[in-house]
Amino acid sequence: MLAEKLSQDLAKAGLQVDAQQQQQLLAFVALLDKWNKAYNLTSVREPAQMLTRHILDSLVVSPHLVGSRFIDVGTGPGLPGIPLAIINPDKEFVLLDSLGKRIRFQKQVAVELGLKNISSVESRVELYQPEQGFDGVLSRAFASVGDMLSWCHHLPAENGSFYALKGQLGDEEMAGIPEGFKLIETIRLTVPGLDEQRHLLKLVKA
């Protein structure tokens, strides 16, 4: 049963998520499963796998976020932004993607789940000009670290950070961090039910 698996995995991950938020996370999985059949939003087809590979994989980042305003670039169907918004109702998340079908899905999720702290924007990241900078710029399965920093350099506030969610870290990618940016922390993430390597890179403007 998905509800039991979610509850157990959240406990293993050391995440405090209340009953209503757990119901919202399960509802998000149900909507993703439903829309995926028509819109091909993710290559993951099984709801139980979505729970592990998408929901838990997003949520384990939560304890490391600093600030109240975040942008999730190349968010796809809203990952990691929507799961993070569900368990952080006091934080604001902008979800940015260039494909209209993904934005339509995100907006439907926001309506059905009653999420007031997300807003979806259809735009290429390099063309998006926010009125104010963000405390954190998030990316997951979006681009190389170097490309992310080059394309998103204008998005953080003065003291904002970049958060890049990565799998296995290669020397080539780590060497590709452009001048003007500094890696300040590499965090090994543990996702219950997932044997693959997961890392969170936290970077700032130098």
Curated annotation (Swiss-Prot):
S-adenosyl-L-methionine binds at G74, L79, V125, E126, R140. InterPro entries: rRNA_ssu_MeTfrase_G, SAM-dependent_MTases_sf. It is found in: Cytoplasm. GO terms for cellular component: cytosol. It is an enzyme of class 2 (transferase). It catalyses: guanosine(527) in 16S rRNA + S-adenosyl-L-methionine = N(7)-methylguanosine(527) in 16S rRNA + S-adenosyl-L-homocysteine. Its EC number is 2.1.1.170. Its main location: cytoplasm. It holds the Pfam family GidB. The keyword Membrane does not apply. It comes from the Bacteria. GO terms for molecular function: rRNA (guanine-N7-)-methyltransferase activity. Keywords: Cytoplasm, Methyltransferase, rRNA processing, S-adenosyl-L-methionine, Transferase. Belongs to the methyltransferase superfamily. RNA methyltransferase RsmG family. PANTHER family: S-ADENOSYL-L-METHIONINE-DEPENDENT METHYLTRANSFERASES SUPERFAMILY PROTEIN (PTHR31760:SF0). Specifically methylates the N7 position of guanine in position 527 of 16S rRNA. This is Ribosomal RNA small subunit methyltransferase G.
